[in-house]
């Protein structure tokens, strides 16, 4: 009985140590009147928290990124009047 308790405790410790913050793929676009400083601030927040900018768009203001949920909430709140954030996924027509 003590042995199984020891194993369960070790498993709990290991699972907590290897917990990974899951990143979402998102597309973030901005209104044309968005100051470049707002976009740069959002990119910096994503990169500083371990996210990755996967593509920067040239025809419109925006970029795609892999970002964790906490950072995504922060970027969304700080840029709510400028940014549109949506999940990056495959879209098809019927």
Swiss-Prot record:
Coiled coil: none
MF-aspect GO terms: endopeptidase inhibitor activity
Alphabetic keyword roster: Signal
Biological process terms in GO annotation: vacuole fusion, non-autophagic
Regions crossing the membrane: none
SUPFAM superfamilies referenced in this protein's UniProt entry, alphabetically: Protease propeptides/inhibitors
Signal peptide region: 1-19
Family classification: Belongs to the protease inhibitor I9 family.
Listed PANTHER family: INHIBITOR I9 DOMAIN-CONTAINING PROTEIN, PROTEASE B INHIBITOR 2
The protein, known as: Uncharacterized protein B24G3.190
Organism from which the protein derives: Neurospora crassa (strain ATCC 24698 / 74-OR23-1A / CBS 708.71 / DSM 1257 / FGSC 987)
